Curated annotation (Swiss-Prot):
This is DNA-directed RNA polymerase subunit beta'. HAMAP family: RNApol_bact_RpoC. Belongs to the RNA polymerase beta' chain family. The keyword Kinase does not apply. Its cofactor is Mg(2+); Zn(2+). The gene is rpoC.
Amino acid sequence: MAMNQEIMNLFNPTTPAQVFDQIRISIASPEKILSWSYGEIKKPETINYRTFKPERDGLFCARIFGPIKDYECLCGKYKRMKYKGIICEKCSVEVTLSRVRRERMGHIELAAPVAHIWFLKSLPSRIGQLLDMTLKDLERILYFEYYVVLEPGLTDLKERQLLSEEEYLRAQDQYGQDSFTAMIGAEAIRELLKGLELEKIDAQLRAEMAETDSDIKHKKLAKRLKIVEAFRYSGNKPEWMILTVVPVIPPDLRPLVPLDGGRFATSDLNDLYRRVINRNNRLKRLMELRAPDIIIRNEKRMLQEAVDALFDNGRRGRVITGANKRPLKSLADMLKGKQGRFRQNLLGKRVDYSGRSVIVVGPELKLHQCGLPKKMALELFKPFIYSRLDAKGLSTTVKQAKKLVEKERPEVWDILDEVIREHPVLLNRAPTLHRLGIQAFEPVLIEGKAIQLHPLVCSAFNADFDGDQMAVHVPLSLEAQLEARVLMMSTNNILHPANGQPIIVPSQDIVLGLYYLSIMREGLPGEGKVFADLAELEHALYSKVIHLHTKIKYRWHWVNEEGENTVRLLETTAGRILLGQVLPKSPKLPFDVINKLMTKREISGVIDQVYRHCGQKETVIFCDRIMALGFFNAFKAGISFGKDDMVVPGSKWKIVDSTRTLAKDFEQQYNDGLITHGEKYNKVVDAWSKATEEIAKEMMKEISAVRKAPDGSEQQVNSIYMMAHSGARGSPAQMRQLAGMRGLMAKPSGEIIETPIISNFKEGLSVLEYFNSTHGARKGLADTALKTANSGYLTRRLVDVAQDCIITQADCGTSLGIKMRAIVDAGTVVASLGSRILGRTAGEDVRDPATNEIIVKRGDLMEERDVEAIHQAGVQEVKIRSALTCELVNGICGKCYGRDLARGTPVNHGEAVGVIAAQSIGEPGTQLTMRTFHIGGAAQINEQSVIESNFDGKIVIKNRAIARNGEGHNVAMVRNMVIAIVDPDGTERATHRIQYGARVHVDEGDMVKRGQRIAEWDPYTRPILTEVEGEIGFEDLIEDQSISETLDESTGIAKRIVIDWRSTRGGADLRPAIVIKGKDGKVLKLARGGDARYMLSVDAILSVDVGAQVKPGDILARISTESAKTRDITGGLPRVAELFEARRPKDAAIIAEIAGTIRFGRDYKNKRRLSIEPLDKNEEAREYLIPKGKHIHLQDGDVVEKGDFIVEGNPAPHDILAIKGIEELAAYLVNEIQEVYRLQGVLINDKHIEVIVRQMLQKIEITDQGDTDMISGEQVDKIEFNALNAKAVEEGKKPATGNPVLLGITKASLQTRSFFSAASFQETTRVLTEAAVNGKVDPLEGLKENVIVGRLIPAGTGASMAKIREVAVKRDRLILDEREKQAAIVPAAAPEAEPLSLPPAE
């Protein structure tokens, strides 16, 4: 490699080899710009229109930028290598490579200084912040409207005072010409910036910050202080933000290209530079001519505008357009956006050696192969073929080889075969949503023009054969081939990186074939026969003595775990024996694994087990065999379906009629005024969705029923049922629409239409039904188009925030971790503890609760067997290591991450876990968004309003508060009542949080059976209950001010609703409430001390009247909740984005920050004042102002725990972090995000979400700066924070304190330590401006920055290279230190001796 470099450098002396570890960005000083430049550009001309040679001193000048042809000067006096380095005396052009025209820069000397628009206009304006002036004032000075006073002298003027033209002249008259200095334009700003004494300002700002009490002022000062410090420490000078010299980029980067027809296409930059040069020259001339001030000023203003447009066109004033009214692309536009330098050329490069074609299925391929059309292969492997032809002596020149290949001679095909053997190619299908979208295969040459793809990898590529295209890429270098073979081969990608499940899973026909193969039917010919071996069985099959599905007995030879040969007599079917033949022989895989009906899920499970017990190679062979078997049997079975396979259940109309009656009842209740319109709507919709479910159940019963033939044998299973049940195609939901009832439809707005579609597709829809059903379908299609883009953007943000998350060490040694429990939702286990801890590292010893012996040691990875043991022992909670608590500075350690899901082994050093996490979360986003329309908007509602026990056990109630109301029901009176079901040995099996106002059917100590009802409630309303017995009284419930009797138009019945009393006349001070009075007419007291007064919120519907007698638990009023909306990932994607962006939800919940007692204070304008008196006397009371329309379901005197909700709603993640800490926040985010994906049946491992959340928690907000340089209130990187604090402690100073802050993914990406990464993500201008002002150094640690500067990424194989380089640098350092020591010792010992000769430095 080094040799090559040297040879290259012989021919290319201009570029020194660049070795660097970091890149720094800062503001260029005028001296720096001149040092880059090879000459000044004085003329706006580009090239001579006759000779087409560049004009001298023009924008393409050869004297400045270098020759146009290699080693040839412009006039042609010197040609060839031998004159290298000579400067021609005639045309002054250096004889060298023309490539220097890509590197050499020029400059323009400006006649008047101009402000750099980025530092002026990019908000916040850096110049403005430094000078403490507003942007408006700055612009007035810069664009020559106002003078600014620099030196007031002895006059009454103040420094930095703005004076208009008249004021300036008046002041000169008043105080005399030279009594004060005022200037105008960029010169004035430059003088101001030059005169800044940063140290003084720094001290002054710190003093002011210490004195101020106002938060806003403090923030403002902190911002200014930050920028002052940036200039102090970065070595940038403030006056450099004003330009006196403009650099000109090399001409080959802004080329002039001749088009046919004698015209030229030019880069927009040339136009922009030309304007600057023209205006600059004109200004020079006017100044020489001593033109009037007003003209010069105008010219200076125009020069400022020209330079602005060059740097950032359109940032200020109107956009400068070219000849065709198109805005010109300025330097800033070259960088930003998808088409900018960063994203188009540095992060996304195009490659040579690639082709694309349509894909077709290749069922006879092995898993590691793909079919490559010969024509395509010939083109792709051309260079290899040429070199082989040459090596074999079949051609002597490339030209000859070319001819041979073009003629497609037979020897060429032989050589192509040789070349292709063992040379993997990469296949890619766009969109590449996760890493399985690019995989390596060994090419097999085929005729035809389409690429053949193995059927089992389709699900990884998300490919189908309806016209999809795929691209082929050839890895050229040996390293690339090696990586393709070892890391990317399709045989290595058996498990899905998102969840560790197999992704090489049979689908469609294969599943159907295997399902058919494994069916067992009663009463078929030959039932009960016994077979000794396969030959007998096949003989019987082929001679039709038995059927594939006949129940038979078979002698199965098997090796058990001790390694002994055993024989079992199995009851099975012929089909299953055939399936058993392809199962790998392993003691861990008994025949029972496949001695059952094979659905897609079962097959996936078998593949998983084969992978775990027999390893990768066996799995691949097994998959190939199982595929062949499935295809063959699907073909033999000849399954098809007809109209009669869709069975409409007989009981359908009975169910429909009864539901219609029910709906009529609700209609009547509404007309009688017993229920509101919203409640009626909810109930009707509920009834219909129940009916639909019931019909679907009936239909499934009939379709799946086993029918007997006259001879007593079981008939074939229904084909449609087979397809759906096996998981080959279709789902019960689709079958329901075909043969049951289509059910409820959603409007485009997401609301559900009350009238359902009663027909199914077999019966056909009526016109009205058809119209209603088009809504859903159309919405589905429109959504798809929109959501694909959203999902792609989410993935991009995720990748950006997590890209530098890499496994950098084996173990960080932390003792921290997070606790994992099973997730139980409404009594059903949604995610078991086992599934959540599998493949994670134990954070502490896991002990058996009964015997207290250790099941898993601390620091061990939990494998399948450990998880099983934990489950058997009935452990409820396990502490595991997590990415969130990993203490490494850079990256994550292997122990905290756990198992590499795609390999099933502990994670390797250098694995890019951040990118994998981002892909795993982003990929299903797109998948799901593309999938909404499959069910045609059929509305699915999940409202849960009963709790049934899932276990037998004993009831234990925590925070019990139950009252018996007037109707004799037991009612839950508190919000934090929890009913648990425990085993006889005391283990909790399930816990249920009981809704306030729910009817409870059990009590403490009761024994319940599985399926018994524990509690129920009305899901559509929230009640307000009374806790004491007495008589109703109203307070501030005044007709037409705070309460209105509304007549329901359709029913004519009045009901009383609390209206917004603040908006009525004279209602501002009202506090509407219901009170309970005793016999003496006084308001009763509650047990905990407050009055029995129940505040009402807007829209509450009263259920009682004045003077009525109530018992505890009776309903005083009820608040109607939102009508049921359908939940579909539409709600999902924005929800996921909202969580990752850490946005505050619209109606955020208000959370109690401390434990204490609730007290209501005086109301404030239109807010209720509520405070919490702490239980712990050391804490301060907290006060909250709550908008009056919000329903506070707490009463005066209630006790709340820290973290309880005062006002219901979605909690803001920032509040959870501040009040409950990182672990709770992580649990909340993980659960919320998982819930969205779970609804869609998508499995994502928790650790991926944890990795992203870790990246969102990288910043710390300083609460107390201690004796450090940090500023309180600013956000600092964790790494920086710890480093600065360590330094402070070392020096004996007081360290700073801070709290972790949660940043959304966009914000976190923009605040990463690498400015390259941030600039290439979004808001390029802002990021670069800020980085330059701060003189930021990019340590090149993440993946993105390394790709940008063209290095190996520090992950995967690049990680080991980085490690080697690190070791080498350390060694070199040691050697050099040793040399320096020796050099120091020798002269001291022998002053007259000659210096010691050392080996040359490396």
